[in-house]
Regions:
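C-terminal motif of bacterial Sec signal peptides marking the signal peptidase cleavage site
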Residues: 16-19
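Core sequence-specific DNA-binding domains of diverse transcription factors
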Residues: 21-133, 173
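N-terminal low-hydrophobic presequence detector
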Residues: 1, 34-36, 474
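Bacterial N-terminal signal peptides that target proteins for export
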Residues: 1-9
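Kelch-like beta-propeller repeat domains
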Residues: 131-474
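Flanking scaffold residues of small Cys/His-coordinated metal-binding clusters
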Residues: 12
Length: 474
């Protein structure tokens, strides 16, 4: 397993801070001709993740002369939102070594600010941090052809990724689609869907007859109950059978039989799509109507439904769908109510549930694991920050990458750059390299080479800003 980016970059900061005078130490004579007015923060222009380097911070007066005897308290910040910074420092004799950890490859700066007088501040020049090949992190890749959030991204048998639908910054629901090619890192347009769709499902039909193998089933996200199939052999969408119920923010799960279970989406109804006939048929109802829930295929072929909400109230309940009987039955409840959360099947057959909006309308930092053997949920160590409407992706080494999400209430309605890794062996989350761009309602798709493609999402809600950028977790 690679070393998490959170352990990446150690910066030794040696601070030459001096001024004179009494009180806060920000005024008086000493070696300068007046009190300190700003800091000069000098840093190298380039660095490699994991390679230590030094910066110099000097307290200067308005004539840019060093102010000796400075005794104020300095607060350090960084443009790297995931940086691990030292506590506020009182610098004895104007000089002290400071250790800082930057987590994110890319361009970062470090800022020194006097606590008592915040106008006394200084920012380093940009530090271009290259990714260490032995470390995890995100890197930008080609942008999509247009903005998308609440869309889908589906790995195809040929290794490309079908990105479809969603909404843009103007509130337009989209019918357009495009393909990401990992070999070139670029997106190209493909045929458009018959209907525009948002918060819908896209399911690769991998186990059906030859006529449907490799096709992708698109269901829901419209005012009516339509469905269509994408054929990667010719890049076109064609209509298929009519679903029993319209669905929005529902789930779709490929079963071992090759059929697809569609459940929830502002309803308690459920139905099955049969690729052999192209028809939908009703199956047993869920115990509770729910949307923004999760559906996870378990090792025994049953499907675990967790959480969700109805009438703006999040649930902690869970239920199991048995394909052999076509019925849903209650199982153990989660330790916390959740909607807009994630559920990821682990290699040990258990299910990791993370984040979401809880019953207090807060973004949750908690996580728990469902054990199919006992039908119960148990808590694990919390995440380092809250995540909702985020992504959680099982990596080749068995860890789970949790990325992005909704930040509330500070600032309200903005995306997060936060990312962390869950290790099932220790049941602990560790920070990893942060996203290059804050986002939620995005997608994460694990590619055949083990990398994870992140596409689109919403950057903020006021004003609405939808993204067309994409990045790769390596």
């Amino acid at each position: 397993m690679k070393i998490p980016q959170s352990l990446a970059i150690s910066i030794s900061a040696i601070c030459f801070l001096s001024a004179c005078g009494g009180g806060s130490g920000n005024s008086g004579g000493g070696g300068g001709t007046g009190g300190a007015t700003h800091f000069a923060v000098t840093a190298p222009g380039a660095a490699t993740a994991g390679t230590p380097f030094t910066i110099a911070v000097v307290a200067l007066n308005s004539s840019n002369r060093t102010v000796t005897g400075y005794s104020g308290t300095v607060h350090f910040t960084s443009s790297d939102a995931q940086a691990v910074l030292p506590p506020d420092s009182t610098l004895a004799n104007g000089m002290e070594n400071i250790s800082v950890t930057l987590q994110s490859p890319g361009s970062s700066t470090i800022v020194a600010t006097d606590i008592a007088t915040p106008t006394i501040t200084g920012t380093s020049t940009a530090i271009q941090v290259a990714m260490n090949p032995n470390l995890h992190g995100f890197q930008a890749t080609g942008a999509m052809g247009g903005e998308r959030a609440s869309h889908t991204a589906t790995l195809l048998p040929n290794g490309k990724v079908l990105v479809a639908g969603g909404t843009d910054s103007l509130g337009n629901d989209l019918a357009t689609a495009e393909l990401f090619d990992p070999t070139t890192g670029t997106f190209t347009a493909t045929g458009s869907m018959i209907s525009s769709r948002i918060s819908f499902t896209a399911t690769l039909l991998a186990h059906g007859p030859a006529a449907t193998n490799g096709k992708v089933l698109m269901v829901g996200g419209t005012a009516d109950n339509t469905a269509e199939l994408f054929d990667p052999s010719n890049g076109t969408f064609t209509a298929t059978g009519t679903p029993v119920s319209p669905r929005f923010e529902g789930t779709a799960t490929l079963l071992a039989s090759g059929k697809v279970l569609l459940a929830g989406g502002h309803a308690s109804t459920a139905e099955l799509f049969d690729p052999a006939t192209g028809a939908f048929a009703a199956t047993g109802h869920m115990i509770s109507a729910r949307d923004e829930c999760t559906a996870t295929l378990l090792s025994d072929g049953t499907v675990l439904i967790t959480g969700g909400e109805s009438n703006l109230a999040s649930f902690n309940t869970a239920e199991l769908f048995d394909p052999t009987t076509g019925t849903f039955t209650a199982t153990g409840s989660m330790t916390e109510a959740r909607s807009g959360h994630s559920a990821t099947l682990l290699n040990n057959g258990k299910v990791l549930v993370t984040g979401g909006i809880n019953s207090n309308d807060d973004v949750s930092t908690t996580a728990e694991v469902f054990d199919p053997a006992s039908g119960t949920f148990s808590t694990v160590s919390p995440m380092s920050s809250g995540h909702a409407f985020h992504t959680a992706t099982l990596l080749d080494d068995g860890t789970v990458l949790v990325a992005g999400g909704f930040v509330f209430p500070n600032p309200p309605g903005n995306g997060s750059v936060g990312a962390e890794l869950f290790d099932p062996a220790t049941q602990i989350f560790e920070r990893t390299g942060s996203l290059g761009t804050a986002r939620y309602m995005h997608t994460a798709t694990k590619l055949n080479n083990g990398e994870v493609l992140i596409t689109g999402g919403e950057f903020k809600t006021t004003p609405v800003m939808i993204l067309k950028s994409a990045e790769l977790y390596k």
